[in-house]
A protein has these predicted regions:
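Bacterial Sec-dependent N-terminal signal peptides
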Residues: 1-23, 297
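Extracellular/periplasm-exposed beta-strand and loop segments of Gram-negative cell-envelope proteins
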Residues: 25-30, 60-118, 145-220, 250-288, ...
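Repeated loop/turn-to-beta-strand initiation elements of outer-membrane beta-barrel proteins
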Residues: 49-51, 132-136, 235-238
Length: 302
């Protein structure tokens, strides 16, 4: 970051030193690369300084995944729990019973859909230290803080899961029928969800929509540092630019609904020492920069 501030200072000094050589030209361009489809407008102050501003449209790519649905500690799967539904319902009032039909149709895995959401805007300053096409570039990208969202693919999928989880919570309440409590305890019946590292992921048992989602969050403001070839506005009618650099978007966070120690909450997940998916949490938390590799065609207006 100190290097970025140093370069920004160099830009300001260069602008001041070259004020008498002010010779602006304007252009528009389109590009493609790791930031998506890039559309921007550009201006050159002189042979040494160029400025670009625009938008980077990232396609909303969707990825499907299957996650095992099982209980927290005992790791019982759905098929092992179906035999207990009628026994549990015997201790519940009509409004709180588990739908045996819905629960019996519940699959062993839940289908999730992940969606990329990373369309950004940018303001970049190109610095040509040698009056050639080679340049250094500083600036910033601006985008959403939630760049990836994961949702249950089937709306209302968690209805029988929530009914089951509410029943387990009911058995643990003070004043619950002792026979009900013993049924749950003696058979190691626990809440249903998915394990991710040291966390137990499950929807809010009181959510009327019976859905759940998780997100990966980064900083919306992302300083940029890079290098490349080509001018913001070419000296001829048509030119090209090549960019190689990184966005500094901070330490990513995985935000998900959890139920641990009897409390439901939406929290930032931290990598632990064990559990399914813990390696994924560790990897995600280490990716503090986003690589930028773009190729751009630019046309000179005047």
């Amino acid at each position: 970051m100190k290097k970025l501030l140093t370069l920004c200072s160099f830009v300001l000094l260069s602008l001041g030193a070259s004020a008498q050589a002010f010779d602006p030209h304007f252009g528009i361009g389109v590009g493609v690369g790791t930031t998506g489809i890039d559309i921007d407008a550009s201006v050159t102050i002189n042979d040494y300084i160029g400025i670009r501003g625009g938008v980077d449209i990232m396609p909303k790519i969707k990825i499907d995944a299957d996650v095992d649905l099982k209980t927290d500690g005992a790791n019982k799967k759905v098929g092992e729990l179906k035999q207990y539904v009628n026994q549990i319902n015997a201790y519940l009032p009509a409004g709180k019973q588990i739908s045996a039909n819905d629960f019996n149709q519940l699959p062993e895995k839940m289908k999730l859909e992940g969606k990329l959401n990373n369309t950004t805007g940018h303001i970049l300053i190109d610095i040509h230290p040698f009056k050639t096409s080679f340049r250094l570039t500083v600036g910033a990208y601006f985008g959403p803080d939630e760049i990836i969202g994961a949702y249950n693919k089937e709306d209302g999928f968690f209805k029988p899961v929530n009914q089951w989880n509410n029943a387990i919570i009911e058995s643990q309440q003070p004043g619950a029928n002792p026979a009900f409590t013993n049924l749950v305890k003696n058979n190691n019946l626990e809440m249903l969800g998915a394990k991710l590292g040291d966390y137990f992921i499950t929807p809010d048992a009181n959510d009327p929509k019976n859905n759940a989602e998780a997100n990966i969050k980064v900083n919306g403001f992302r300083p940029y540092l890079g290098l490349g070839f080509g001018r913001a506005v070419p000296k001829k009618r048509i030119g090209c630019q090549f960019d190689l650099g990184v966005q500094f978007w901070g330490k990513p966070e995985v935000i998900a609904p959890t139920y641990d120690n009897g409390t439901f909450k939406v929290e930032s997940l931290k990598a632990g020492n064990s559990g399914d998916g813990d390696d994924a949490l560790k990897t995600i938390s280490k990716i503090s920069v986003y690589p930028v590799l773009n190729f751009r065609l630019v046309g000179r207006i005047f």
